[in-house]
């Protein structure tokens, strides 16, 4: 048996004091029977950085998206579509709705979430959804 890390942020690890590099991280994971990783992006610049950092590997695939807490800057939807269509990208996201920390970006979060779902449908890719503080929401998004 082996394990799959279905949601890791390889671009957000401490490469100064905890890990030497991505090879080191993946070797440590493999030593604990984690043989495959889905590297999840939270911004489009972060996705690009992560792709460059990780490179092409047999044991890592990617998602491409904009996290709801990263809606302070606009992004190009066509850029999202183009990046999400790249080889090795198997999912959209991390996207979703998070009104707990940034309720002021609610309209932007909703529009972004719709864009991710729409592109996911176009590209036939699943969507990684982040939700927080949505239990009592009764309005449509």
Task: Report residues per predicted region.
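Mid-domain alpha/beta scaffold segments of enzyme catalytic cores
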Residues: 1-138
